[in-house]
Amino acid sequence: MEIEKTNRMNALFEFYAALLTDKQMNYIELYYADDYSLAEIAEESGVSRQAVYDNIKRTEKILEAYEMKLHMYSDYIVRSQIFDDILEKYTDDAFLQEKISILSSIDNRD
C-alpha cells in the first residue's frame, strides 16, 4: 500500500469519520490505521475478503467525494501553512503568536 494514499485516507477519515456508517468506519480504521490485511478484516467481521475490499473501495470514494464538496482537509492544510508562515515572520509579536496559537488549537480539537 502506498504511503501517500494511506496518509491521505487517514487524514480524510479524521475529518469525515462521523459521516460514515459504523461498518465503513471500522473497515477503514482497521485497514489504514491499524494496517490489517483484507483477509484479517474479513475473518474478524465474518464476511468474504471481496466484501471487505468492495466496502473499503466504496468508502474511499465516499471520503474523496466529501472532500471534493466540503474541502475540510485541503482548507486545513492551507490554514496550517498560513499560520506557520505568520509565526515564522512575526516571531517577536507576542499578541499575534497568541492569537495564532488559539486558532491552531481550534483546528486541533477532537
From Swiss-Prot:
Pfam family, one: UPF0122
Listed InterPro entries: RNA_pol_sigma_r3/r4-like, UPF0122, UPF0122_fam_protein, WH-like_DNA-bd_sf
Range of residues in the leader sequence: none
Function comment: Might take part in the signal recognition particle (SRP) pathway. This is inferred from the conservation of its genetic proximity to ftsY/ffh. May be a regulatory protein.
Family named by the database record: Belongs to the UPF0122 family.
NCBIfam families noted in UniProt: PRK00118.1-1, PRK00118.1-4, YlxM
Protein name (record): UPF0122 protein SAG0983
